[in-house]
């Protein structure tokens, strides 16, 4: 394949941003496969195809983008958020599809850590394509949808986000147990959109008994979103003998595990790669004690209580030097509330 002038760096960066947005749009729909985004640029550097991973067993992102581009892909560049796969599973290898389409160059963001699928970059280079791994762009409002999946491959368990809503002085409920609602409408709507991007929502039996949650993902009008995460309860208490308690979960269906470790093992084996822990305080403490929290979504409301229930129900450490620390990833204003995203 003949040499081709490199596309402008600004064009390549813009294409990567579009690919990341495409991947982010399918979070919650692809597990156990990664939510990948792909963009095809023609030989002049114009976007002619955008694709994202389809549900398991369907087309990968590169195939969707190539279908959209058609013959315009020939001599062009593929920009992908994950190294194109090089194996045949339920679908064929994306590396070979890119070669067959006449693609001249490939930019990819993350190397594929899956030993079964890796090798795409080497196969593309061996076929004469210009291949390079690029870094993530510093673009506002663009998130890397692959971070949970990458961790799940590395750790062989789902990525865990601990989510809670608290007052300015750190309480999740008043002394009498009331907590609805600490945050405002915008924050609660954001939570429902976030739930739809996860493979499972996890609560403890205490929360199941006390709050009778549905653990659904809904639109602002109350209707159910298309993607509903699995409902998971951790604890040994039997919800089926609960009488009038936990009726919503018994009506909608749920899975139950005795411990956090067994839950993550079971969920990973069944294809979950990205889970959200919503409480309560005992469960949050258990996940942190087991060093199994990878990210935190803290919704902070401009409310003061002075006393009440906290995010955790016990001390994690005896001295500050040993406390687990996270770094801030993003801060999002949601009406009068603030969502602060942290990661390890």
Language-model regions, residue ranges each:
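Proteins enriched for Cys/Gly/acidic motifs involved in redox and nucleic-acid/cofactor modification
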Residues: 28-32, 121, 130-165
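Active-site beta-strand termini and strand-to-loop segments that position acidic
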Residues: 42-43, 154-155, 343-344
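Enzymes that bind and transform nitrogen-containing heteroaromatic metabolites
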Residues: 2-33, 49, 90, 122, ...
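Generic alpha-helical secondary-structure signal
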Residues: 18, 68, 97, 144-145, ...
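Short capping loops/turns at secondary-structure boundaries
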Residues: 113, 117, 153-157, 180, ...
């Amino acid at each position: 394949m003949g040499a081709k002038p490199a596309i402008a760096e600004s064009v390549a960066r813009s294409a990567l941003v579009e690919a990341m947005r495409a991947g982010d749009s399918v979070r919650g729909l692809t597990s156990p496969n990664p939510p990948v985004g792909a963009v095809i640029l023609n030989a002049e550097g114009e976007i002619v195809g955008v694709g994202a991973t389809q549900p398991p067993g369907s087309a990968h992102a590169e195939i969707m983008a190539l279908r959209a581009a058609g013959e315009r892909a020939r001599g062009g560049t593929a920009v992908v958020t994950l190294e194109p796969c090089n194996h045949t599973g339920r679908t064929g290898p994306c590396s070979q599809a890119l070669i067959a389409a006449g693609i001249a160059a490939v930019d990819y963001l993350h190397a594929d850590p899956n030993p079964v699928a890796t090798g795409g970059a080497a196969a593309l280079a061996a076929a004469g394509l210009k291949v390079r791994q690029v870094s993530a762009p510093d673009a506002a409002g663009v998130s890397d949808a692959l971070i949970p999946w990458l961790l799940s491959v590395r750790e062989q368990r789902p990525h865990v986000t601990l989510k809670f809503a608290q007052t300015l002085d750190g309480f999740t409920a008043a002394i009498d147990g009331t907590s609805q609602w600490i945050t405002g409408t915008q924050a609660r709507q954001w939570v429902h959109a976030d739930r739809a991007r996860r493979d499972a929502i996890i609560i403890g039996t205490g929360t199941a008994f006390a709050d009778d949650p549905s653990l659904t993902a809904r639109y602002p009008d109350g209707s159910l979103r298309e993607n509903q995460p699995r409902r998971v309860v951790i604890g040994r208490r039997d919800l089926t003998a609960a009488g009038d308690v936990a009726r919503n979960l018994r009506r909608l269906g749920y899975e139950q595990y005795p411990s956090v470790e067994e839950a993550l093992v079971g969920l990973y084996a069944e294809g979950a790669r990205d889970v959200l822990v919503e409480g309560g305080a005992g469960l949050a403490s258990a996940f942190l004690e087991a060093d199994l929290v990878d990210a935190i979504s803290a919704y902070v409301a401009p409310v003061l209580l002075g006393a009440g229930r906290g995010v955790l129900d016990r001390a994690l450490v005896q001295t500050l030097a040993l406390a687990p620390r996270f770094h801030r990833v993003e801060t999002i204003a949601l009406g009068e509330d603030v969502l602060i995203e942290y990661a390890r």
